[in-house]
């Protein structure tokens, strides 16, 4: 464990300031992310250095299509998530934490990337933003060694820690799940507005940004809602790549797979205002 960044003491309780949940924790409590815990009146990052998944992937798998194409990237994942999406694609490591992990120091991660001849490190699989302290330490060291840092994220973080992190992040794929607060609240236990703010901050930074939306029948496949999503992205930069991904039943959601025709219609709508639109899981 390592002491967490971004928290404050409020009397006998601890308030976490990393993400918009602002968890208020008593001694022994763990945040909604399941990896930030109060012990001895301090907040600790319990997943620091804990790695559940290590792989070398094509950069396109993140997915990033317009950044170092046809390159291989060392990909690291930990455990936990600060959203509770019913359709989680990586629920074994994001929601159900009883899985084996191993310790990997920041130095070891950087050395492994160089050994694998990777041009950088991708922080992915689970939610890397709640791996914040390790992510920040490793990203700083990676930059010192000339490596790139890639973030694959739900974007659920407060502006101050995000801006500090972006100093060392070179590219981001952000999962913009829907364009209604109802979806985020009921399906993910989060807030859309907070994620939209993250998108804006990343777009204003030097990091390359791509966005992914998983299209789910009856939940976020309304074409008018899709137009809102496209308008939002286009208002920032019409060249931001958008990945529209096909849903398959997973975790707690058993809706049928998204019809391919829905994806094709969505692509047509998106291409009216965006330059780079891609389909996934087709």
Predicted feature locations:
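Flexible, active-site-adjacent loop/turn segments at secondary-structure boundaries
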Residues: 5, 23, 30-33, 46, ...
